[in-house]
Design a protein with these regions (language model features):
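Conserved histidines in hydrophobic membrane contexts and catalytic metal-binding motifs
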Residues: 14, 100, 176-182, 203
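A general secondary-structure signal for short beta-strands and their flanking turns/coil
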Residues: 68-70, 93-95, 171-175, 191
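A short, surface-exposed beta-strand/turn
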Residues: 86-112, 186-206
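Intrinsically disordered or highly flexible coil/loop and linker segments, enriched in small
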Residues: 23-24, 142-145, 187
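Accessory, solvent-exposed terminal regions and/or long lumenal/extracellular loops of proteins
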Residues: 169-173, 183-187
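Preferential activation on post-signal-peptide N-terminal prodomains/segments
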Residues: 1-89
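Charged, low-complexity helical/coil segments in non-catalytic cytosolic or luminal regions
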Residues: 90-172
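Generic short beta-strand segments
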Residues: 75-82, 157-159, 179-183
Length: 206
């Protein structure tokens, strides 16, 4: 926690503002604690790195104080309590489309990307998590590898598809998101998180 306010209280204040704006977000929140002395050290490192690589040196802040302390929150939008996933995903793409910077004076920055007003078109019946596990087992069964796969979480989400930039519209499809921890058989201490998506009606890999 930062001196000006506990992290939980800061997020509570942010949530209240988002509610007033009609922005529904997940409770799965990432928070970076931006403490002024740490930011000062990181700035010095960035300048030293730029000098070493002979690249453009970033402009240094005159002085870092407690007034610069802030929380940087990241999360994603939901609709009818289900996460809405962006159309482009994977390595290099961030699923968190809502970000907020909050300091002792309140919200300093709030952004939401890739948002589409949503309306109910039709209801669908989704397959059970048990069927998803079977599909996941088959999926990894087709991979020739000695790696170890551990299912961390399976959650029902909605994925943006068929984006029409001209009409500023898109459709969403229900998907099961499977978070799997992959442990490298050759490097026991090396592991990474893999996300696999199945269409929640057809179990087709997306």
């Amino acid at each position: 926690d930062l001196p000006f306010m506990p992290q939980k209280e800061a997020w509570k204040n942010v949530s209240e503002v988002l509610d007033k704006l009609g922005v529904d977000v997940s409770d799965d929140v990432i928070c970076y604690v931006m403490e002024h002395s740490i930011m000062s050290e990181e700035e010095k490192k960035a300048i030293a790195r730029a000098e070493e690589e002979d690249t453009k040196i970033p402009t240094a802040k005159t002085q870092w104080t407690e007034d610069d302390d802030c929380y940087y929150f990241m999360t994603y939008t939901t609709w009818q309590d289900y996460p809405v996933l962006p159309p482009v995903m994977g390595e290099g793409f961030d699923e968190n489309n809502v970000s907020v910077i909050y300091n002792k004076n309140g919200i300093q920055s709030l952004s939401r990307n890739g948002y589409y007003p949503l309306e109910l078109k039709n209801e669908v019946e989704v397959v059970s998590p048990e069927m998803v596990l079977k599909a996941l087992e088959k999926y990894f069964g087709n991979i020739i590898s000695d790696d170890i796969y551990e299912v961390q979480r399976i959650s029902l989400c909605q994925k943006v598809v068929q984006v029409n930039p001209d009409k500023h519209s898109a459709e969403i499809e229900p998907v099961w998101e499977c978070r799997v921890l992959v442990k490298n058989s050759d490097l026991p201490d090396s592991s990474y998180l893999q996300k696999i998506y199945f269409h929640a009606e057809t179990l087709k890999v997306m």
